[in-house]
């Protein structure tokens, strides 16, 4: 269990690192955010199974709801930016003009 928890934490850290490294493209950033949410979901599912608290059993479902909302908003923004500017390259956007 310890090695799987370590692997999940490493997956979260690599996704966080990918978010910082590939922040110029919106699609890459969204994929890294989904990796972070997936690792958080698996980590909370493991921790809710190991603890015997009834409150912890609903936490993975709440994280899945937030991940679905984040994915929907991210894809809507990606579609809007791609149709408006023709690319997902974030460095070309001037957010003060939006």
Curated annotation (Swiss-Prot):
Record-listed E.C. numbers: 7.1.1.2
Class of the enzyme per the UniProt entry, highest EC level: translocase
A biological process from GO: ATP synthesis coupled electron transport
Gene3D superfamilies: 1.10.287.3510
Subcellular location: Mitochondrion inner membrane
Keywords noted in UniProt: Electron transport, Membrane, Mitochondrion, Mitochondrion inner membrane, NAD, Respiratory chain, Translocase, Transmembrane, Transmembrane helix, Transport, Ubiquinone
Pfam families assigned to the protein according to its UniProt record, in alphabetical order: Oxidored_q2
Membrane topology reported for the UniProt record: Multi-pass membrane protein
Catalysis: reaction(s): a ubiquinone + NADH + 5 H(+)(in) = a ubiquinol + NAD(+) + 4 H(+)(out)
InterPro entries: NADH_UbQ_OxRdtase_chain4L/K, NUOK/Mnh_C1-like
MF terms in GO: NADH dehydrogenase (ubiquinone) activity
Cellular component GO terms, alphabetical: mitochondrial inner membrane; respiratory chain complex I
Assembly description: Core subunit of respiratory chain NADH dehydrogenase (Complex I) which is composed of 45 different subunits.
Functional note: Core subunit of the mitochondrial membrane respiratory chain NADH dehydrogenase (Complex I) which catalyzes electron transfer from NADH through the respiratory chain, using ubiquinone as an electron acceptor. Part of the enzyme membrane arm which is embedded in the lipid bilayer and involved in proton translocation.
Family per record: Belongs to the complex I subunit 4L family.
Official protein name in the record: NADH-ubiquinone oxidoreductase chain 4L
